């Protein structure tokens, strides 16, 4: 059924793909920001611009949803998908603002690793969203969703290790609190990527 309905309203997939491209762009900018730990304000401003562009795409998608009689799949799934995708960029923006404003003395290897995992998750979000136009690629979609799930688990493990190390080695309570917020936001990005993967899995399994 999904294959028969998709050609009637391809605009949704254009919007999903455009938003996913912004997600990857934002994640790369964030990874570069944390990796180099320099020009923080400039990185944060670029991420703000990316997030604003993504917000416009989200608004356009929701407006289209209200105006379209035949949708490529369930309306609630469309709304959930674009909303969760937008959540990813909102969190990327939150991390960038926190890093720029918190006056951190340093960025830890664990924060860099989490940012890299976030970028890998976001790149796979773009892949699964791009594959949604063809349900015959269900195996590839589900495989990539599984990769997102594994990356989210990796982020959980890195965060637990990072917090343990932070509490053992950092004597400045303010720095502990600031880094903990950064870690939590980064890990939550991977949670939202996993949410997207779960939504996509549901779409594929229900319509293939």
Where are these regions (language model features)?
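Cytosolic, long alpha-helical scaffolding segments
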Residues: 1-208
């Amino acid at each position: 059924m999904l294959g028969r309905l998709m050609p009637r309203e391809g605009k949704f997939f254009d919007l999903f793909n455009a938003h996913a491209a912004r997600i990857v762009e934002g994640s790369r900018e964030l990874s570069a920001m944390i990796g180099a730990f320099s020009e923080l304000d400039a990185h944060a401003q670029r991420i703000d611009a990316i997030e604003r562009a993504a917000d416009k795409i989200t608004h356009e998608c929701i407006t289209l949803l209200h105006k379209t009689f035949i949708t490529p799949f369930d309306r609630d799934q469309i709304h959930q998908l674009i909303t969760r995708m937008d959540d990813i960029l909102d969190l990327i923006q939150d991390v960038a603002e926190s890093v720029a404003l918190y006056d951190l003395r340093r960025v830890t290897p664990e924060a860099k690793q989490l940012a890299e995992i976030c970028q890998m998750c976001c790149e796979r979000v773009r892949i699964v969203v791009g594959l949604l136009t063809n349900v015959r690629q269900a195996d590839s979609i589900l495989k990539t969703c599984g990769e997102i799930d594994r990356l989210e688990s990796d982020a959980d493990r890195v965060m637990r290790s990072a917090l343990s190390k932070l509490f053992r080695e950092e004597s400045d309570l303010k720095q502990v609190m600031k880094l903990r917020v950064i870690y939590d936001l980064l890990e939550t990005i991977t949670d939202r990527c996993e949410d997207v993967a779960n939504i996509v899995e549901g779409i594929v399994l229900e319509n293939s």
